[in-house]
Amino acid sequence: MVTIKIECRTIARGVAEGEVLLSEDALSFLGNVDPKTGVVVDPGHAIYGECIRDKILVFPHGKGSTVGSYVIYQLKKNNVSPAAMINIDSEPIVAVGAIISDIPLVDRLDKDPFTIFKNGDRVKVDSTSGFVELMDR
């Protein structure tokens, strides 16, 4: 059993564990995700049909409307939000959404998350301490 610890930059503080859901596509929470169910509803999106509830959602960055921050908040209020989010490079829409929703958010990992993580991996995000752990693989 090996645990890999990766340093990162903290955007929104917190600690969460969960299963990785990778999306190589940028994500617009307004329009791509149903705020009532947490399901990705855009048929052109890489993770179309997937539910982000309780996942460690890994995606390059957000895109789209500033309303996306409030969609993230609505996901949290509806108990269908991701447990944590990991970005290559966070932008203000996702950052604000994570902060107001108390969802841990990190970016700028020391290692490329798309080469180190696989869908279904167990990951701990400790954005308070500035690291992500890939649990026993």
From Swiss-Prot:
Family (UniProt): Belongs to the AcnX type II small subunit family.
GO molecular function, one term: hydro-lyase activity
Record-given protein name: Phosphomevalonate dehydratase small subunit
Keyword Chaperone: no
InterPro entries: PMDh-S-like, PMDh-S-like_dom, PMDh_S
Source organism: Methanococcoides burtonii (strain DSM 6242 / NBRC 107633 / OCM 468 / ACE-M)
Active site: S65 (proton acceptor)
Class of the enzyme per the UniProt entry, highest EC level: lyase
Catalytic activity from the UniProt record: (R)-5-phosphomevalonate = (2E)-3-methyl-5-phosphooxypent-2-enoate + H2O
